[in-house]
Regions:
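Short, surface-exposed patches at the edges or C-terminal ends of soluble domains, predominantly
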Residues: 55, 88-90, 131, 170-177
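Short, internal strand/loop/helix patches
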Residues: 102-149
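Short active-site neighborhood of thiol/selenol oxidoreductases, capturing the structured segment around
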Residues: 60-87
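Thiol-/selenol-based redox modules, centered on thioredoxin-like
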Residues: 142, 148-177
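Extracytoplasmic
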Residues: 63-66, 98-100, 141
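Membrane-entry signal-anchor segments at the cytosolic-membrane interface
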Residues: 1-8
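Conserved helix-turn-beta segment immediately C-terminal to the redox Cys motif
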Residues: 22, 84-104
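N-terminal "domain-start" segment that seeds a small globular fold
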Residues: 8, 12-15, 24-60
Length: 177
């Protein structure tokens, strides 16, 4: 009887861990973005983005690099620009890994010429030709949502309008190594 109790003490945690794992729970895994379900691959979907110079955005780059897509709501102005600047700063804070992240802005850029010029320092400006990303574009004026895309074109996380840039940075540090 005593041996059975000892075996149960060791088996019970394994059974609980197995049940939690089977139910999909993962310890300590908490991202700031929302998972994109069902999973989307922009290469497989042939999602076309036309850049300002007329070229197409290459989802699969010559080097494995992530893409952060910023999707602007209507009338990108002060708040929108502040968020975009925060994202560009977060990219710089990746230090030696900042070259592993490309920044792509889709939508109408800010009307202010100074802000537009400042933006083009860090961001590639383009547009979603077929509107396949329309579901992720915020409806709120002067806002931005973001989508983090893996180097193979798989969309990982959605950061809806109003997201916190430090949370985005924490997630990027976890996945961009």
């Amino acid at each position: 009887m005593f041996l059975l109790l000892v075996a149960l003490v060791f088996a019970a945690p394994m059974l609980v861990a197995g049940l939690l794992s089977w139910s999909g729970w993962q310890p300590g895994v908490k991202g700031n973005g929302h998972p994109i379900l069902p999973q989307r691959n922009f290469v497989a979907e042939q999602l076309q983005v036309r850049l300002g110079d007329g070229t197409s955005w290459p989802w699969r780059d010559s080097e494995p690099r992530f893409t952060l897509i910023a999707l602007a709501g209507p009338d990108c102005a002060a708040q929108c620009f502040e968020t975009l600047t925060g994202i560009a700063k977060a990219r710089v804070m990746l230090n030696r890994n900042q070259s592993r992240l490309r920044l792509l802005y889709l939508g109408t850029p800010p009307a202010d010429p100074g802000r537009r010029a400042a933006m083009q320092t860090y961001w590639k400006l383009g547009r979603d030709i077929d509107g396949k990303l329309a579901a992720y574009v915020p409806a709120t004026p002067d806002s931005v949502s973001a989508v983090l895309v893996e180097s193979n074109g798989t969309a990982l996380s959605l950061y809806p309008a109003g997201f916190e840039v430090p949370g985005l940075l924490r997630d990027m540090v976890k996945v961009i190594r």
